[in-house]
Amino acid sequence: MNKVFKNSWALFLGMGAIMLAYGYQNALLGVRAVIEEFSLASTGFMMSGYFVGYFIGARTIPSVISGVGHIRVFAAFASIASLAILVHSIFVNPLTWFLLRVITGYSMVSIFTIAESWLNDLSLIHI
């Protein structure tokens, strides 16, 4: 058990930080939408973009991972997700935010998929 924890603590810590940061971003986008006086319909539309990207990513990410590799895909989509979050402050438009949320959803599902596959690889080694 100690060996498994010793080999996987960084993965859990990193994923915890990513999930915490995404949770803050998700909550603060709703607050920012109210401050910018978006309508309720446009706020709902904008926030639903995450799930559109998540659905598309869940269907396509396995082929991307098998084509390029886990580490490259993780690094690329972690960078893309952080860039999309930063661009929200530059463009204050519900349609732009919807597209950025699609990108964020696609990136997050790829990060989650890769972390899960790394965890599965670690558990298979130590069984």
Segment roles from a protein language model:
Residues 90-92:
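Helix-breaking motifs and short loop linkers at transmembrane-helix boundaries and internal kinks
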Residues 72-86:
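Structural signature of the two symmetry-related core transmembrane helices
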Residues 5-51:
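Helix-loop boundary and gating motifs at the non-cytosolic
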Residues 110-123:
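Intracellular juxtamembrane helix-capping segments at the cytosolic ends
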